[in-house]
Amino acid sequence: MKVLWVALVITLLAGCQAEVEPEPEPEVQLGQEWPGWQDSQPWEQALGRFWDYLRWVQTLSDQVQEELLSTQVIQELTVLMDETMKEVKAYREELEGQLAPIAQETQARVSKELQAAQARLASDMEDVRSRLAQYRSEVQAMMGQTTDELRGRLASHLRKLRKRLLRDAEDLQKRLAVYRAGALEGSERSVSAIRERLGPLVEQGRARAATVGTLASQTLRERAEAWHQKLRGRVEEMGTQARDHLEEMREQLEEVRAKVEEQGSQMRLQAEAFQARLKSWFEPLVEDMQRQWAGLVEKVQLAMATSSTSAPSENH
């Protein structure tokens, strides 16, 4: 199966470099919806939003004309471009990580082809943005004059650019689909290969154990013991590798936990320092207010006592 997968990838790569008669580009109608694909990926959905926005721009309606004279359309297209290429890059890197089981040279060629297809798609979207920016400059230079010819040229350019965008998007989608299928096949093949290698060993072990139990020959027992040691060595080796991997993961988790605890300690110390600072600020104020309040209460009490003693005197 591995040979078939490698042959498929090499054939696809070679076919992309062969000189063939160019197929006629599909006619892209103004109102044509983004084709989309079954079980579409996030990058395909983002590209669909770019396509729908471009379709709206291509109507060259009064609202489009007004926003083209500002920077709104170009800014919104830039946001959609960045979102699309970000999703494409993330999906491509995910597939490259899953292609680890294939040969290093083949993997490098696959990565190169995916990057080239991604670059073509980015170039198509950049051409759209550049053409709209150019149209905006030309319209502003011809303020007060008829712009029908410019609008016609822009509409023609946008139709051609949408054809290229559709063609290169479908090319990238087909490549990613092929490589994704190969990655899934490679993962399943790795599990099957391990099962195929260990299955015969287990069966042989059972057969040898049964044979040793029925034979009294010391030579056969020694051979069985040697085979047993060999099998145990292989199992221990695989177990050691698994433990090393788990230990590495544990160390990484410990590092993360230590960093989190360190940051938590720093935040706690900062909070305590801030609390102490606040306390040092407000304690003198509170004490001063308490003293003033006590003095005020004392004065009120003294005034009330003076008033009560002077009242009887006046009665006499």
From Swiss-Prot:
SUPFAM superfamilies: Apolipoprotein A-I. Residues 265-316 are annotated as: Homooligomerization. Keywords: Chylomicron, Endosome, Extracellular matrix, Glycoprotein, HDL, Heparin-binding, Lipid transport, Lipid-binding, Oxidation, Phosphoprotein, Repeat, Secreted, Signal, Transport, VLDL. The modification Methionine sulfoxide is found at M142. It is found in: Secreted; Secreted, Extracellular space; Secreted, Extracellular space, Extracellular matrix; Extracellular vesicle. Residues 157-167 are annotated as: LDL and other lipoprotein receptors binding. Sequence repeats lie at residues 79-100, 101-122, 123-144, 145-166, 167-188, 189-210, 211-232, 233-254. Residues 277-289 are annotated as: Specificity for association with VLDL. Heparin binds at L161, R162, K163, R164, H228, Q229, K230, L231, R232, G233, R234, V235. It comes from the Eukaryota. One of its GO terms (cellular component) is intermediate-density lipoprotein particle. GO terms for biological process: acylglycerol homeostasis; cholesterol efflux; cholesterol metabolic process; chylomicron remnant clearance; high-density lipoprotein particle assembly; intermediate-density lipoprotein particle clearance; lipoprotein biosynthetic process; melanosome organization. Residues 209-289 are annotated as: Lipid-binding and lipoprotein association. APOE exists as multiple glycosylated and sialylated glycoforms within cells and in plasma. The extent of glycosylation and sialylation are tissue and context specific. Its main location: secreted. Belongs to the apolipoprotein A1/A4/E family. Homotetramer. May interact with ABCA1; functionally associated with ABCA1 in the biogenesis of HDLs. May interact with APP/A4 amyloid-beta peptide; the interaction is extremely stable in vitro but its physiological significance is unclear. May interact with MAPT. May interact with MAP2. In the cerebrospinal fluid, interacts with secreted SORL1. Interacts with PMEL; this allows the loading of PMEL luminal fragment on ILVs to induce fibril nucleation. APOE is an apolipoprotein, a protein associating with lipid particles, that mainly functions in lipoprotein-mediated lipid transport between organs via the plasma and interstitial fluids. APOE is a core component of plasma lipoproteins and is involved in their production, conversion and clearance. Apolipoproteins are amphipathic molecules that interact both with lipids of the lipoprotein particle core and the aqueous environment of the plasma. This is Apolipoprotein E. The lineage of its organism: Eukaryota, Metazoa, Chordata, Craniata, Vertebrata.
